[in-house]
Amino acid sequence: MMGRKNSKQVRYSNRLILINRLSQLSDPLICQILSHLPIKEVVTTSVLSTRWKNIWLSVPSLELIYSIFPNFNTFRSFGDRFFDSTRVSCIHNLKLYFDEHDACYLTSWINAFVTRNIRRLYVRRVRGNYFHELPLSLYVCETLVSLKLFHLTLVDPEFVSLPCLKIMHLNYVWFPNDATFERLVSSCPVLEDLKIDVLWNDGRVYRVKSRSLKRLRLLRSSTMVFDSVPGVVIDAPLICYLRINDRVSETYILNDLESNAKLDIHLDFGSEDFGEPSVSSRRSRIRSFLPAISKVMGLKISENTFKVIHHYSNLAQLPQFDNTSRLHVTLRVSELKWLPNFLECCPNLKSLIVAFNGDFEKMGSEEMNQISFLLRMKRIVDMTIFMYTSKVLLHSDNINQLSFSSVPKCLLSSLQFVELNAQILRFDGEILNLAKYFLENSSILQKLTLHPNKYGSTYANMLHKFRRRSRTCQFILTDLE
């Protein structure tokens, strides 16, 4: 018993020593330390001494989450006290989460942020369907560097001045009209990073005009607006990275892209059918889009976009992708026969990644069921599985169904790295034939990478027996990450 009492006294004594040492620090330094603690722990420091009573109100960084408070009134009362616009201390970083309750306090709180020189602001409406409006003061914040908004409404301002804003992420944010978004972006003279996740009921045209923008990501997966023609217009000559995942927009206009830019495009051109008739009806839009992407060094193309480009190539000549040195394309096994035609347009390609959306169109259901059954048999040794799958795949007619009639220029002069991004046991004969095609026809190929799974390594090693045109070519087997 005496030992426990002494132990408590030692711990209490150590706490006093720590508090005394902290108290010797300046208020700004204490606030900086407190800003790294959860808000509940920050507030509890107010009971340490008279000096500490109000120090927590001056911390420069805060994460305020409505759900940690017992009720809405407590949450609002805390915020009203902390976001007092008469305080002179700065609020550098703030994350604010709130729910569907009346958010009339937002105006006064945000006005306080702006007055107290906010630098990084993250505001998220977590629950509810009402999109609360943000006040006009946010549009004229002279110190704001990063702005990230979720499920909110931006009103239409007459004037915007955000001279320091470099990062802006707008996730499911509602704009009253097209001009509001365009004015917001164009009024940020040093903006470098822009991310837009578009609402499902937003059918507007997004115009991004910026002389400073370097990174742009736009996601629009669906829409329920049928009386508009959504689109995307990008005029940002300094962009280094552009990712568009858009299943809705019918028009895409890209102006003056940098040649060293990297593009990641998942575009459907507003179509649900990717056959040649559908592509033909959008021919002029596709024709105006392709020259812009043909100028970039790095290009990643989704399966649907690849289909659109292929069917367009049957209607008109594709532009030459002379600057493209890195290509990542996703397709189905049944679409492999289209790949060489596109590679013909990339004469200087150095690196190629082919990712596969799994389909077993060429393999009968009986064969697939037999393979699945064997893979579930715990007592079957790896070699038995290898021998059976090899018999099904390598000795089927599939291995001869893929025929490339030509060798693109890039294989003879520039292609150095190829990766076939799929699990080996999901390969049918066509993918094996593709690996063989690259090995036998690439003059300066340095590395061909495949991804075997647990039972596929022995099977993949058979590819080592294929003839290699490039003497320096390495064959790499590695797990998919």
Swiss-Prot record:
CDD domains, sorted: F-box_AtFBL13-like
SMART domains on file: FBD
Start and end residues of each FBD domain: 401-452
Annotated Pfam families: F-box (PF00646), FBD (PF08387), LRR_At5g56370 (PF24758)
InterPro entries per record: F-box-like_dom_sf, F-box_AtFBL13-like, F-box_dom, FBD, FBL13/AtMIF1-like, LRR_dom_sf, LRR_FXL15/At3g58940/PEG3-like
Highest taxon above the source species: Eukaryota
The keyword Repeat is annotated on this UniProt entry: yes
Keyword Ion transport: no
Sequence intervals crossing the membrane: none
Domain called F-box: residue spans: 19-69
Keyword field: Leucine-rich repeat, Repeat
Extent of the LRR repeats: 123-151, 173-198, 328-356
Official protein name in the record: Putative F-box/FBD/LRR-repeat protein At5g25850
Organism for this UniProt entry: Arabidopsis thaliana
